[in-house]
From Swiss-Prot:
Any single biological process term in GO: methylglyoxal catabolic process to D-lactate via S-lactoyl-glutathione
Cofactor comment: Binds 2 Zn(2+) ions per subunit.
Pfam families noted in UniProt: HAGH_C (PF16123), Lactamase_B (PF00753)
Binding site for Zn(2+) 2: 60-61, 133, 171
Gene: gloB
Cofactor(s) needed: Zn(2+)
Organism encoding this protein: Pseudomonas putida (strain GB-1)
Catalytic activity: an S-(2-hydroxyacyl)glutathione + H2O = a 2-hydroxy carboxylate + glutathione + H(+)
Pathway: Secondary metabolite metabolism; methylglyoxal degradation; (R)-lactate from methylglyoxal: step 2/2
Gene3D superfamilies the UniProt entry points to: Ribonuclease Z/Hydroxyacylglutathione hydrolase-like
Molecular function via GO: hydroxyacylglutathione hydrolase activity; metal ion binding
UniProt binding sites for Zn(2+) 1: 56, 58, 112, 133
Claim: Disulfide bond is one of the keywords in the record: no
UniProt protein name: Hydroxyacylglutathione hydrolase
Length: 259
């Protein structure tokens, strides 16, 4: 059984630490900074870092990769279509990778970057998703490289995963995302309740993650483009009717970019 903990980095990044407590082996996801991982390993000298998983090429996700590989000899697994430092295993849609005895399916989710991938395991005991900067808690990443035609289907695909799937995204953006979700759906009681819950967590300096796919379906406007009120708000923002899920998504994303 794998334990998952967050190692905070920079101002709002999370490096996810996967731990096989029986074998004292661990892996990390998107180590943008080596220092938090180095500190953990120094405090736990009996542990071995075996794998580094990377979702995309942005420096706040890969900045610590080469240092950690040099220190530990860990295998670096990342997207085939992006330049990932120290990469040993190039991964693309449909590939599978075994990490700490867990098999992860690789999902291509372009949009934030063109080669962005996510890692999904259906368990046991619980399905987990490492979504990088594609799906956030109550939000999604900006489209730095991709298009709405790429990103909306990618998000819809993640939304179709089992509702109990735990979502481990890479940033603590939940509260600001929920402020936007409240503007899009002011009458959504699930959004309001989540906003209150996350406000309490952050006031106590506690993290708001993981989320679940089920919770995202209820509260994430970027997964709710078929909802009448969401479409109406997107139409108001653009000043015309958006006639497809992609168009509604594009309107929401452009609104959020300036929110």
């Amino acid at each position: 059984m794998i334990q998952i903990d967050a190692l905070p980095a920079f101002s709002d990044n999370y490096i996810w630490l996967l731990q096989d407590t029986a074998k004292r082996r661990c892996a990390v996801v998107d180590p943008g900074d080596a220092a938090p991982v180095e500190r953990w390993l120094a405090a736990n000298p009996e542990w071995v870092l075996s794998d580094i998983l990377v979702t995309h090429h942005h420096n706040d996700h890969v900045g610590g990769v080469e240092r950690l590989k040099q220190l530990s000899g860990a295998r670096v697994c990342g997207p085939a279509n992006e330049r990932i430092p120290g990469r040993d295993l190039a991964l693309d849609e449909g590939d599978k990778v075994d990490v700490l005895g867990v098999t992860f399916q690789v999902l291509a989710v372009p949009g934030h970057t063109l080669g962005h991938i996510a890692f999904f395991s259906d368990g046991p005991p619980t399905p987990v998703l490492f979504s990088g900067d594609t799906l956030f808690a109550a939000g999604c990443g900006r489209m730095f490289e991709g298009t709405p035609e790429q990103m909306q289907p990618a998000l819809a695909r993640l939304a179709a995963l089992p509702e109990q799937t735990e979502v481990y995204c890479a940033h603590e953006y939940t509260l600001s995302n929920l402020r936007f979700a409240k503007a899009v759906e002011p009458t959504n009681t699930h959004v309001q309740q989540r906003f209150e819950d996350v406000t309490r967590l952050r006031a106590e300096n506690r993290i708001s993650l993981p989320s679940t796919i089920g919770l995202e379906r209820l509260t994430n406007p970027f997964l709710r483009t078929s909802e009448t009120l969401v479409k109406q708000k997107a139409d108001e923002w653009k000043g015309h009717s958006n006639t497809s899920h992609v168009a509604v998504f594009a309107a929401l994303r452009s609104w959020k970019d300036t929110f």
